[in-house]
Swiss-Prot record:
Chief location: cytoplasm
Species of origin: Rhizobium leguminosarum bv. viciae
Cofactor(s) named in the record: Zn(2+)
Lineage: Bacteria, Pseudomonadati, Pseudomonadota, Alphaproteobacteria, Hyphomicrobiales
GO function term, MF aspect, one: aminoacyl-tRNA deacylase activity
Pfam family, any one: tRNA-synt_2c
Protein's name according to its UniProt entry: Alanine--tRNA ligase
Length: 201
């Protein structure tokens, strides 16, 4: 991959081939959402779908959402310039299922994307799961062949997603790549986690 355009097109094309509707990025200033100054995540344009207030013509979607994070729950502003991975503006690539598939299919799609679509070396990958989510840990072993040392259990909000104080929520899983010993930092959940060695994507 030679750059961001290749990454974006590989991601969107992969999910389109797997039955997802490509949905354009919504505006940076959300329409009809007084809770946000800026769109800060890919799911923002689907809030009403997740809560059952709106129905779309598709049950799976993929996006490359333009996002700004300068305050609130997802404030990256304080980390800009201190890490190699924090910016205020970025594109969030996402895939969404609205009652179509669940955890097993999501993990399988993610694994095939990173190992076949992006051709990342399997031996350098590891995942995090919410500490109480045995199902996800079992699925990562089954689908990716991971041993326990490649599955890091996190008990904090880092692996429990919630839309807000109320509403949709649940455990999540993240994939990390080890960038090598020449990059400072420790694996997720360690005291050295804030380094850039283990990059989440």
């Amino acid at each position: 991959m030679s750059g961001v355009n290749d990454i974006r097109s590989t991601f969107l094309d992969y999910f389109k081939k797997n039955g997802h509707e490509i949905v354009p990025s919504s505006p940076l200033v959300p329409r009809n959402d007084p809770t946000l100054m800026f769109t800060n995540a890919g799911m923002v344009q689907f809030k009403n779908v997740f809560t059952g207030l709106e129905k779309r013509s598709y049950s799976t979607a993929t996006t490359s959402q333009k996002c700004v994070r300068v305050g609130g729950k997802h404030n990256d502003l304080d980390n800009v310039g201190y890490t190699a991975r924090h910016l205020t503006f970025f594109e969030m690539l996402g895939n969404f299922s609205f009652g179509d598939y669940f955890k097993e299919n999501a993990i399988e799609l993610a694994w095939k994307l990173v190992t076949e679509g992006f051709d990342l070396p399997k031996h350098r990958l590891l995942v995090t799961v919410y500490s109480e989510d045995e199902e996800a840990a079992t699925l990562w072993k089954k689908i990716a062949g991971f041993s326990d040392d490649k599955i890091i259990r996190i008990s904090t909000s880092d692996n429990f997603w919630q839309m807000g104080d109320t509403g949709p929520c649940g455990p999540c899983s993240e994939i990390f790549i080890d960038q090598g010993e020449n990059v400072w930092g420790g694996p997720p959940g360690s005291p050295e986690e804030d380094g850039d060695r283990f990059l989440e994507f």
